[in-house]
């Protein structure tokens, strides 16, 4: 039997929490005002109609409605929210 406890590595064994980025509400989903649509770093997706952009580039809905992802300007993407009654 060992009379001394084995020494473990004290410098490893940690990792930082992932950032949980990405699309949170997809095209066709119904959202309420203030709902987060996309969490991102930089503008991979640009804000469209009725969508605001936070200080950390998070996109959020400014009105209740239905989410729609659209292409515009040479390969760029934007996300818009259209009121539910207008899309019917």
Swiss-Prot record:
Residues 1-21 are annotated as: Disordered. It holds the Pfam family Ribosomal_L27. Transmembrane segments: none annotated. Coiled coil: none annotated. Keywords: Ribonucleoprotein, Ribosomal protein. SUPFAM superfamilies: Ribosomal L27 protein-like. GO terms for biological process: translation. This is Large ribosomal subunit protein bL27. It comes from Picosynechococcus sp. (strain ATCC 27264 / PCC 7002 / PR-6) (Agmenellum quadruplicatum). The lineage of its organism: Bacteria, Bacillati, Cyanobacteriota, Cyanophyceae, Oscillatoriophycideae.
């Amino acid at each position: 039997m060992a009379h001394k406890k084995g020494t473990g590595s004290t410098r490893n064994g940690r990792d930082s929490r992932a950032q949980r980025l990405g699309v949170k509400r997809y095209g066709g989903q119904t959202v309420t005002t203030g709902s987060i649509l996309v969490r991102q770093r930089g503008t991979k997706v640009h804000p469209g109609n009725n969508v605001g952009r936070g200080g950390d580039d998070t996109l959020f809905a400014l009105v209740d409605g239905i989410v729609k992802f659209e292409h515009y300007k040479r390969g760029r993407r934007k996300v818009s929210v259209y009121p539910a009654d207008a899309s019917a």
